[in-house]
UniProtKB/Swiss-Prot annotation:
Subcellular localization: Secreted
Name by which UniProt lists this protein: Kunitz-type serine protease inhibitor D
GO MF annotation terms: serine-type endopeptidase inhibitor activity
GO cellular component, one term: extracellular region
Residue runs in coiled coils: none
Organism taxonomic ancestry: Eukaryota, Metazoa, Ecdysozoa, Arthropoda, Chelicerata
Transmembrane segments: none
Length: 17
């Protein structure tokens, strides 16, 4: 439920790879 398009890669982690 987070905007992975705006959060850093460290926050997205598994979502951004």
């Amino acid at each position: 439920a987070v905007d992975f398009s705006k959060v850093p890669t460290a926050t997205a982690g598994p979502c951004k790879g």
